[in-house]
A protein has these predicted regions:
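Compositionally biased, charged N-terminal/linker segments
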Residues: 1-44, 128, 135-139
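GIY-YIG nuclease signature motif recognition
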Residues: 8, 64, 124
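Aromatic- and Lys/Arg-enriched surface recognition patch
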Residues: 61-121
Length: 139
């Protein structure tokens, strides 16, 4: 079975990379957008996800892995949305900022640019690998 790649956005004041690292494995909950929620249902155990700090930082800071596939989000009273569990994989050597992503021609079709409000989005393997390359360069 092939691995899929994703980007998960989080507000650092709500759930930061540091929180994720301390927890090691935790629930990714609180998604209330239908498209983002549908993306959660497509995730499979072992899929790789970039951890993106939204709001002020606007940068990819780490990698997590889907540890448990979707289940009902216990924080959702309407019972319409799902959660997943993610496991910390590693911190990126250097954060990859939204500005750097926008300037990279290989990433111009990324949902992060095309659908900037979406909090859970698919990535191609080429996009994932290009971001990994950028994370090894300090700019």
């Amino acid at each position: 079975m092939s691995k899929n790649y994703w980007l998960l956005k989080s507000e650092p004041s709500t759930w930061s990379w540091q929180d994720q690292v301390k927890s090691k494995i935790d629930m990714w909950d609180g998604v209330r957008n239908y498209q983002a929620g549908n993306n959660l249902t497509k995730m499979k155990k072992g899929d790789q996800c970039f951890f993106y700090h939204s709001v002020n930082e606007k940068s990819i800071v780490g990698i997590v892995e889907v540890h448990k596939e979707h289940y009902p989000d216990p924080t959702d009273k309407s019972k319409k949305f799902v959660a997943i569990d993610v496991k910390t994989v590693k911190k990126l050597k250097y954060p990859v900022t939204l500005d750097r992503i926008k300037k990279n021609q290989k990433l111009k079709e990324m949902p992060l640019i095309k659908q900037s409000r979406l909090s859970v989005m698919p990535l191609t393997i080429d996009e994932f690998n290009e971001i990994l390359k950028l994370s090894n360069i300090n700019e």
